[in-house]
Amino acid sequence: MELDLLTAISPIDGRYRGKTDALAAYFSEFALIKYRVQVEVEYFITLCELPLPQLKGVDKNVFETLRNIYRNFSEADAQRIKDIESVTNHDVKAVEYFLKEEFDKMGGMDDYKEFIHFGLTSQDINNTSVPLSIKEALEQVYYPQIEELIAQLRTYAEEWTAIPMLAKTHGQPASPTRLGKEVMVFVYRLERQLATLKSCPLTAKFGGATGNYNAHHVAYPEFDWKAFGNRFVAEKLGLEREEYTTQISNYDNLSAVFDAMKRINTVMIDMNRDFWQYISMEYFKQKIKAGEVGSSAMPHKVNPIDFENAEGNLGVASAILEHLSVKLPVSRLQRDLTDSTVLRNVGVPFGHIVIAIQSSLKGLRKLLLNETAIYRDLDNCWSVVAEAIQTILRREAYPHPYEALKALTRTNQAITEASIKEFIEGLNVDEEIKKELRVITPHTYTGI
């Protein structure tokens, strides 16, 4: 069976491929191989720039030709590496052999081929390639999409800034708020957590078989290989080298990235659930698209499917991020292989997250404000002004104001505008205080 949108096992590469396609450039098998080639090429160039004595004869003019190997990397190139891997049974060694073939094609590079992957272990390539792919996926896909979501929420927050709304705590009526402010809560939370994510350093392991530059030092003890590694990782890859490691990355900073992404997911889940609830409360209607069906049995249905889709995908993403976060920093002694297969799944939560962001945006852009329903709930809940009245009475040293309002409102009788006004008129306070109390309504008692 040929792999296509209908035969793919994962919905990320099947049903939702149209939403996740941009991530293929960072997390596909092709992308991983390309990143490995890039790191190997840049490492060789940096050895030439040092220079190692045996590499002094390399013409600097070939550097751009070398870089074109990964800049112009094709699916045919990736397939060649996979063919080599079928013999070597080692993915990174296959990249090394591929580059030696490319050196042969260039001509004049035969004396330098053994400096490809010189002194390195596979994880020096993997633990630079993967964080580099994550860095670029964040910058080029994730950040723009999450910032688009925040911008849409901010637009609504500003548009609805003056819309009073009954708040609900414990599912029960509470002091009124403003719809725009409630949306702004999510803007604030997302921006804060996004800033935290952006502050997480993306680090890489680069230090030989057990993190000590053993091979480098024994061959060239005169060079400061730690300084070399720091410079290479920072200047050529835009990452930060982990100073002390085993054979593999410590993954602590990558774990912090995943935890930060998970917190953003949590905020988005909260947001999607709230908008779902507001739709259920009829505070929003949804734009209807001709031809769409809401239920196979109930023709009238217009379901909040986009918010539900987002919530579901965010849950899957967070579950995987949690495993990545707690598993990757743990490895037996100087290294076991469990991180390798787990790390190949890094793109999966990214896929579910971008699906969720796009679904959230789609749901938000379908919303039609239903002020009638919002105002109806306010008009039917005059009990919420009790807090305002008792607070002013406290200010005036009125005896037992809380208890007086409790006796009025904590009953099974409906509290109406008339009953509140009757209570105010019966108070033993100055007329000026009564005037102050009379203007308080569920529509105006919304704070600042």
Regions found by a protein language model. Name each.
Residues 223-247, 251:
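Active-site-adjacent "gating/activation" loops or surface patches in catalytic cores
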Residues 43-46, 102, 149, 153-156, ...:
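Amphipathic alpha-helices that form helix-helix packing interfaces
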Residues 134-135, 142, 183, 250, ...:
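Amphipathic alpha-helical coiled-coil segments and their boundaries
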Residues 193, 240-242, 246-332:
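Glycine-rich anion/phosphate-binding loop at the beta-strand->alpha-helix junction
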Residues 2-213, 220-232, 294, 307-309, ...:
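A helix-coil-helix interface module used to build multimeric assemblies
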Residues 181, 255-263, 388-395:
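Short, well-ordered beta-strand elements within core beta-sheets of diverse protein domains
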Residues 158-161, 202, 276, 283, ...:
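Alpha-helical coiled-coil oligomerization motifs
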Residues 2-29, 61-71, 293-448:
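Catalytic-core signal marking the mid-to-C-terminal active-site face
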